[in-house]
Amino acid sequence: NLFDAKLIKNNDKYAVELGGHVVELSEEKQAALKANNVAEQEITLGLRPEHISLSDSGVAAEIDVHELMGSTIHLHANADGKDVVIVVSTMDMTTEQINSLRGGAKINFTFGGNVCHVFSKETNINLEA
């Protein structure tokens, strides 16, 4: 999943903003961005489907298609016009929760500041490298 997002600084800490949702980056990513003297900027944010989690708040999306794959559900959703693939574990979900993840359902998702990837929008270079 690749998103148009913003790299911002709050109290000298780097964070990414996606769909109005702000996630502070991990200490390792903080150090790499500081070492590279990276400024606030528009970025391409990379997120693997298995690193996205459903949440009560976060980035809003609507499920287009769901695929039950045994112990996971693969969700194909739309977040502000952008296609998103999310892989959700069903291990700790009730049948009711699993059944609620159907086409047309409204969801919110988030991600950890340690698992996202920050790329320059202009050069496509990983800003953490």
PLM regions with names:
Residues 2, 6-129:
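Non-catalytic connector elements of ABC transporters
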